[in-house]
Swiss-Prot record:
This is Leucine--tRNA ligase. Pfam families: Anticodon_1, tRNA-synt_1, tRNA-synt_1_2, tRNA-synt_1g. It comes from Legionella pneumophila (strain Lens). ATP binds at residue 578. It is found in: Cytoplasm. GO terms for biological process: leucyl-tRNA aminoacylation. CDD domains: Anticodon_Ia_Leu_BEm, LeuRS_core. GO terms for molecular function: aminoacyl-tRNA deacylase activity; ATP binding; leucine-tRNA ligase activity.
Length: 823
């Protein structure tokens, strides 16, 4: 055993052992409690950054700890390998996306191996492999057969730079989430999956996710956006269809002074066909900002269509406007405007000098309608037969009236819209559909799956190369035998990441999407990833899990039992980025200090949910601690090996109850730390685990070894310390455990047990405050009376109370604190 800690040698030795023994390859075991730990799989960008190191170390620490508890632990890894960056790199560097992706995977896999993460590599998944996406295509066809998939023309979010459709969630502040381009509105034929059919369950089952952050659940509730309201029908003059609007405030219906429709509403297009100014307005709104957060602050613009609607109760005509603040994807794309009782409608009415009619009277307060709208409930006025009703009652009465007169109905509305999964890009899973002039849309037969993405395509930087690949596009219809064409859109990459966790459970299954192993391993017991995925990946994965459940592929309702959302890694107060020049290279860190130091620092520097501020001195401090542990173990190696031999031969036994006082006290501290660290591991509070390990090490390194019992105490304590540290710094703990003569490998060692008798103590440490300020400390018997404790406190704080009158002595037992109040 070398005297000096050499992390490179230590880590190579540990990793070779794990590889040789296949330590992390697992199979199903019904005799053990299973634990499935998964970090969101990475996109193969080519290099790991410190955010990756933190995220995947968190998952690894949890997996190793659960294994030490005796559970059957699965921790797989794979690659979310489709997506725009590979295609963009192909255009820029003239290299095929597949080649670029494979090269990056190889580089990142090497980095993961150096970190020492306990992955079952035989389950590795790469989503661009046909063997993976074959089953995605198969499942999509099953959904199509069940009526959960459809294709229709839809106004979509179009990214003019990436030349593709974006989901609502992929539009950030009106711009494409990858390109940053201003998003346009465009009508295009799209494939959709009916996520709205599961809206109620997606909402209600959030309540079962007790181990998810409240913030994430609330974000999903807001995104699903369930509201109970009323659908109201307005007849339109010289227009064949009624205009449907949705409102949660039918009590304000009598105050409607105009209607407004979205720029892409059919009625707006009808008006534009006969009105040049309306068409010009629609054209000016093509780049409209669509992020809801911006609707409140953006300039509200509109134009009168010249068309009018009939109020369903009064029969009066109301002008219909096109407005940029009405969104087609929410509600019906039309709203009734009540300027007196909706601030947005009020601002629009002020700008265009539209009438403001008060129909709700505030209760107990005055309101100036010239200054703003009154948006709360109250008593109805100016509402004909509904006058004097409270808003809460009027909502029900007016809705009933509308239903009786076929002018509306009570309804439930959702903000959530069906998931558009088409992307006009090359590097993605081909959508397994055929378009035949005779037969319409025909699914690819199962025996012809997978539809393999061709690699002989040209990249021009715009549109989809698949449309130019005749060998791919032209095909015979499997139904009628006539010439047909393949669908050239590919899946949104969120489709691949919506079910990968289940495929990990049965990697290698060639005859089915999933098998019974998926039912054994799912749901994932602990999922780790960023909160930025709250309303995209996490919602889609929950949806897919329910789809797979209903297909009989899994037997649980939710995919992820517990969710940990880690914070970012910052340097100088900012997120690490090349543009700011504050990036820390994990390779350099590992080459200089070793993977264990990197792991120890990222676990110690901050609680997992909070942002981590990078500190070079913190890294050096973590490294110094590991060197001290190594040096201490080396110093006492012979003694510890002898004690191990005694224990293994059955001769090593200590009656701790008969041990001397100082040993009992130190052993009490060690087991107190063990109990707290175990509790902290259970709560994923790894920073306090490390803090406890440092305290434990200080306790034993300062301990004077004088008797045989002392040797057994040091042996027991170093055994506890190494097992506490092993999930966080697995390499050094593996080597020290072996070199100190402990039985088996530490990866197979059970979690240390707290000796409850050691937690009991004959003595208690007290602190003494004088007028609230810490002045002294002393040790007293647990049997000491209050009088004895106060006397001891006075004695130890003598210099601070002499010549003063002690007015009161306050004992706080649970804090072992005595406060002397002097005059």
């Amino acid at each position: 055993m070398d005297n000096t800690y050499n992390p490179q040698e230590v880590e190579e030795q540990a990793q070779q052992y794990w590889h040789k023994k296949q330590s992390f390859n697992v199979t199903e075991d019904l005799n053990k409690e299973k634990f499935y730990c998964l970090s969101m799989f990475p996109y193969p960008s080519g290099t790991l950054h410190m955010g990756h190191v933190r995220n995947y170390t968190l998952g690894d620490v949890i997996a190793r700890y659960q294994r030490a508890l005796g559970k059957n632990v699965l921790q797989p890894i794979g690659w979310d390998s489709f997506g725009l960056p590979a295609e963009n790199a192909a255009i820029k560097n003239k290299i095929p996306p597949a080649e670029w992706t494979r090269k990056n995977i190889a580089a990142m896999k090497e980095q993961f191996l150096r970190l020492g993460n306990a992955y079952d590599w035989k389950r590795e998944i790469t989503t661009c492999d046909p063997e993976y996406y074959r089953w995605e295509q198969w499942f999509f066809i099953r959904l199509f057969e069940k009526g959960l998939v459809y294709k229709k023309n839809a106004v979509v979010n179009w990214d003019p730079v990436d030349q593709t459709v974006l989901a609502n969630e992929q539009v950030v502040d009106g711009r494409g989430w990858r390109s940053g381009a201003l998003v346009e509105r465009k009508e295009i034929s799209q494939w959709f999956i009916k996520i709205t059919s599961y809206a109620d369950e997606l909402l209600s089952s959030l309540d079962s996710l007790d181990e998810w952050p409240a913030q994430v659940k609330q974000m999903q509730r807001n995104w699903i956006g369930k509201s109970i309201g009323t659908e109201i029908y307005f007849n339109v003059n010289n227009y064949p269809k009624r205009l449907k609007i949705y409102t949660t405030r039918p009590d304000t219906l009598m105050g409607a002074t105009y209607l407004a429709v979205a720029t892409d509403h059919p009625l707006a297009k009808e008006a534009a066909s006969n009105n040049k100014k309306v068409q010009e307005f629609l054209d000016s709104c093509q780049g409209i900002k669509i992020a809801e957060a911006e609707l409140a602050t953006m300039e509200k613009r509109g134009i009168d269509t010249g068309m009018t609607a009939i109020h369903p109760i009064t029969g009066k005509e109301l002008p219909i406007w096109v407005a940029n603040f009405v969104l087609m994807q929410y509600g019906s794309g039309a709203v009734m405007a009540v300027p007196a009782h909706d601030q947005r409608d009020w601002e629009f009415a002020q700008k265009y000098q539209l009438p403001v009619k008060q129909v709700i009277k505030p209760i107990g307060i005055e309101h100036d309608f010239n200054q703003s709208a009154y948006t709360e409930e109250g008593i109805l006025i100016n509402s004909n037969q509904f006058d004097n009703l409270l808003s809460s009652k009027a909502i029900q009465v007016i809705t009933n009236f509308l239903e009786e007169n076929d002018a509306g109905k009570a309804t439930i509305n959702y903000r959530l819209r069906d998931w558009g999964v088409s992307r006009q890009r090359y590097w993605g899973t081909p959508i397994p559909m055929i378009i035949c002039e005779q037969c319409g849309i025909v699914p690819v037969p199962d025996e012809e799956l997978p539809v393999v993405l061709p690699e002989n395509v040209d990249f021009t930087g715009t549109g989809s190369p698949l449309t130019q690949c005749k060998e791919f596009v032209n095909i015979t219809c499997p139904k009628c035998g006539q010439d047909a064409t393949r669908e050239t859109d590919t899946f949104d990459t969120f489709v691949e990441s919506s079910w990968y966790y289940a495929r990990f459970a049965c990697k290698g299954q060639e005859n089915a999407m999933l098998d019974d192993r998926a039912k054994y391993w799912t749901p994932v017991d602990q999922y780790i990833g960023g909160i930025e995925h709250a309303v995209m990946h996490l919602l889609y994965a929950r949806f897919f899990h329910k789809l797979m459940r209903d297909e009989g592929l899994v037997n649980s309702d939710e995919p992820f039992k517990a969710l940990l959302t880690q914070g970012m890694v910052l340097k100088d107060g900012h997120k690490m980025s090349k543009s700011l020049g504050n990036v820390v290279d994990p390779n350099h860190l590992i080459n200089t200090y070793g993977a264990d130091t990197a792991r120890l620092f990222v676990m110690f520097a901050s609680p997992p949910e909070q942002s981590l501020e990078w500190s070079d001195s913190g890294v050096e401090g973590a490294h110094r601690f590991l060197k001290r542990v190594w040096a201490f173990s080396h110093q006492h190696r012979d003694m510890l090996i002898d004690i191990n031999d005694s224990i293994l031969s059955g001769n090593g036994h200590v009656d701790w109850k008969e041990a001397e006082s100082r040993l009992k006290k130190s052993r009490h501290i060690v087991h107190q730390i063990l109990a707290q660290a175990t509790h902290d591991y259970d709560r994923n509070q790894f920073n306090t685990v490390v803090s406890g390990c440092m305290k434990l090490f200080n306790e034993i390194s300062d301990y004077s070894i004088e008797t045989e019992n002392d040797k057994f105490f040091i042996h027991s304590s170093i055994s506890i310390l190494l097992r506490l540290l092993a999930p966080i710094t697995p390499h050094i703990c593996h080597c020290l455990w072996q070199q100190l003569g402990f039985d088996k490998a530490i990866i197979d060692a059970p979690w240390p047990k707290v000796d409850k008798s050691a937690l009991k103590t004959d003595e208690v440490d007290y602190v003494v405050q004088v007028n609230g300020k810490l002045r002294a400390q002393f040790t007293a018997s647990t049997d000491a009376t209050e009088e004895e404790l106060i006397a001891a406190a006075k004695e130890h704080a003598h210099n601070f109370v002499v010549n003063h009158t002690i007015k009161k002595a306050i004992i706080v037992p649970h804090r072992q604190l005595i406060n002397l109040v002097i005059g």
